[in-house]
């Protein structure tokens, strides 16, 4: 008769993180905190500008307002726990906290994959079908695409995370990372995880490979349309319209490909932690800078908002 293992769920997980390099923890704390503050401030400004400036009430900026909210939520699901572990001697996270962390991070990561593909379709419609753009990207479609992105990400997170949470865990409760990821939780299971792995590969295909394919096809059509534009000014405007999105897609998918789609032996586990640190902390902070520095409309709206607030405050002081 087969012996039944002790499969009680642990009350806490130990996040080893960067504990093997204690000399780096203080430096990493300062760096991570700085990037986190920049991320919250920058993404918050993008959301505020997108909602307050009527000139930005277009399909492109409707989707753009979703992206910074995603970035803020994603980094907030991971960074506070990371900062606590870097600062103090405790390197633990509760079982419930770990579950919430991988539910939310999986949900928001999948949502961003679909949203970036949706934004590429919006750019395709704007450049390749300019005369029909307002008809194609009508408000109902934009709302439907945004909802599909959020609900699609939520669905795959609910399925994958629930399957992971149902795994009987036994033995070691140490996670050699700085946040809870489903593949690492699966490694702690004492049963066969083939079903979980199959679901993870299927979700990766649907939410990573297919959106990336749509992005590449969209930009293939866009590149062909831009090359047909005769005037240099027209080509420059078309390039500026897409450059911010291309930069964000390159950062996001570049990190994913470098992290997950390489042969296992080509990247050490320690290198993997720093790559994960890049896409969870650095990328969300860079995205608003990319959109403000490379987008004249956002810069103009931001300048207008600052001047309006400054002039309004000066006027009120003068009346007093």
Curated annotation (Swiss-Prot):
Membrane-crossing residue ranges in chain numbering: 27-50, 59-80, 102-121, 141-159, 197-220, 238-260, 274-293
Segments on the Cytoplasmic face: 51-58, 122-140, 221-237, 294-320
A GO cellular component entry from the record: plasma membrane
Lineage top rank: taxon: Eukaryota
Keywords, alphabetical: Cell membrane, Disulfide bond, G-protein coupled receptor, Glycoprotein, Membrane, Olfaction, Receptor, Sensory transduction, Transducer, Transmembrane, Transmembrane helix
Residues carrying covalently attached carbohydrate according to the record: 6
Role description: Odorant receptor.
Family: Belongs to the G-protein coupled receptor 1 family.
Name under which the protein is recorded: Olfactory receptor 2C3
Organism for this UniProt entry: Homo sapiens (Human)
Lineage of the organism: Eukaryota, Metazoa, Chordata, Craniata, Vertebrata
């Amino acid at each position: 008769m087969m012996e039944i293992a002790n499969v009680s769920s642990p009350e806490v997980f130990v996040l080893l993180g960067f504990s093997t390099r204690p000399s780096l923890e203080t430096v990493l704390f300062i760096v991570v905190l700085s990037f986190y503050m920049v991320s919250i401030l920058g993404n918050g400004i993008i959301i505020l500008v997108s909602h307050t400036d009527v000139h930005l009430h277009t399909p492109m900026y409707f989707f753009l307002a979703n992206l910074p909210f995603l970035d803020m939520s994603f980094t907030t699901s991971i960074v506070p726990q990371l900062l606590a572990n870097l600062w103090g001697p405790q390197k633990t996270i509760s079982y419930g906290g770990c579950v919430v962390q991988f539910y939310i991070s999986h949900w928001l990561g999948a949502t961003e994959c679909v949203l970036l593909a949706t934004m590429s379709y919006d750019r395709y419609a704007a450049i390749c079908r300019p005369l029909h753009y307002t008809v194609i990207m009508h408000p109902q479609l934009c709302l439907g695409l945004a909802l599909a992105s959020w609900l699609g990400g939520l669905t795959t997170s609910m399925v994958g995370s629930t399957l992971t949470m149902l795994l009987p865990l036994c033995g070691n409760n140490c996670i050699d990372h700085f946040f809870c990821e489903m593949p690492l939780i699966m490694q702690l299971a004492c049963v066969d995880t083939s079903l979980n792995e199959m679901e993870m590969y299927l979700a990766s295909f649907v939410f990573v490979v297919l959106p990336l394919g749509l992005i590449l096809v969209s930009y293939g059509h866009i590149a062909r349309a831009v090359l047909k534009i005769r005037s240099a000014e027209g080509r420059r405007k078309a390039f500026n319209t897409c450059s911010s999105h291309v930069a964000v897609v390159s950062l996001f998918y570049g990190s994913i490909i470098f992290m997950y789609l390489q042969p296992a032996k080509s990247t050490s586990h320690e290198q993997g932690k720093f790559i994960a640190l890049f896409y969870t902390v650095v990328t969300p902070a860079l995205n608003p800078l990319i959109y403000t520095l490379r987008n004249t409309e956002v810069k103009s709206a931001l300048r207008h908002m600052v001047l309006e607030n400054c002039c309004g405050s000066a006027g009120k002081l003068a009346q007093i």
